[in-house]
Amino acid sequence: MIDSSIRHRIDPAFNAIGRTLSSMGITANQVTITGFALGMMALPLLAFEMYYSALFMGTLNRVFDALDGAIARDQGITDVGGYLDIVLDFIFYSAVVFGFILAQPEQAVYGAFLIFSFIGSGSSFLAYSIFAEKNNLTTRARGIKSIYYLGGLTEGFETIITFILMCLLPA
């Protein structure tokens, strides 16, 4: 819900950094994969209840996620890059939840419900993007993206705030 309203504030900084990294020969896919690897380090950190360290790795993942898009806009968006970005984001999001489940198995039903909701929203997100592609629907409200999608009640910003609160205030 908030993502499209804050893009004009954060994109200029990320785009400037992205252009610099691009000029150094760094590709968007390299940043995507590196960010994913950093984010996946949060899984064992969460499992061992090292929440601040997990938060740091998760934050790096999100920064790299913003940078890969900025680099892609500079170098040219590719289908492979869009695929990697979406798939690795979904894996990261579910890995964070799984890390919390490993830390507190007695809370697994809540984590299972959250992953269930990710599957539902992720499926509708991807199905709508196929529909939008076939019907030539586009917008730049969320920046230049490899796929088009509608805004939702909760998007990336709200998801990250929730994950931050979960790390800072574990039950």
Stretches found by the model and what they are:
Residues 1-18, 87-171:
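A feature for the membrane-embedded catalytic helix bundles of lipid/isoprenoid biosynthetic enzymes
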Residues 1-53, 158:
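Topogenic membrane-insertion module of multi-pass membrane proteins
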Residues 13-23, 47-48, 71-79, 138-145:
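Short juxtamembrane and helix-loop transition motifs at transmembrane-helix boundaries
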Residues 26, 56-59, 80, 108, ...:
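Hydrophobic alpha-helical context, especially transmembrane and signal-peptide helices
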Residues 30, 76, 147-150:
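Short, flexible coil/turn micro-motifs enriched in small/turn-prone residues
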Residues 32-80, 113-116, 171:
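Membrane-embedded alpha-helical segments that form the functional core of polytopic membrane enzymes
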Residues 37, 71, 84, 154-158:
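Gly/Ser/Thr-rich beta-alpha loop segments that engage phosphate groups in nucleotides
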Residues 59-109:
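Hydrophobic, well-structured mid-protein blocks that either form specific transmembrane helices
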